[in-house]
A protein has these predicted regions:
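Short, acidic loop-to-helix structural element flanking the phosphoryl-transfer center
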Residues: 1-6, 46
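Asp-based, Mg2+/Mn2+-dependent phosphohydrolase catalytic module
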Residues: 9-122
Length: 122
């Protein structure tokens, strides 16, 4: 994680989403998890992102949000003050009424390069 905090903001039921995360073996890699079912509203509402910011103890302006859904992830995180990164996965739709991202990637393997660019690390 390049010495940075890592959080997951996800829509859905608490138990279902936690089971998914356990199956993906995220234990030890993630600092905080926010599940919309616990917050009472789903992304793209800004509340789940605000809760994550509070849990991490960082202002949204210092947070990068990586997601594959143009509305829930890109637009939701942008409205909450995060810097969004869109992962252009197969099956995603185009941005129609949503402003394009400054950062767009084809795979999550490109994220460290974006982090270095944002933080001006060679």
């Amino acid at each position: 994680t390049m010495g940075m905090k890592l959080g997951i903001v996800t829509n859905g039921d608490h138990d279902l989403q936690m089971n998914k995360l356990r199956l993906l073996n995220f234990d030890g890699f993630v600092d905080e998890i926010v599940i919309s079912g616990d917050v009472g509203v789903q992304k793209p509402d800004t509340k789940p992102f605000e809760v994550m910011s509070e849990k991490l103890g960082l202002p949204p302006s210092e947070l990068l949000y990586v997601g594959d859904n143009p509305l829930n992830d890109v637009e939701g995180s942008r409205k909450a003050g995060y810097t969004p990164v869109w992962v252009k996965t197969i099956g995603n739709w185009c941005f129609e009424d949503i402003e394009r991202c400054e950062y767009e990637v084809d795979t999550v393997a490109e994220i460290p390069e974006i982090v270095r660019k944002i933080n001006k690390i060679p």
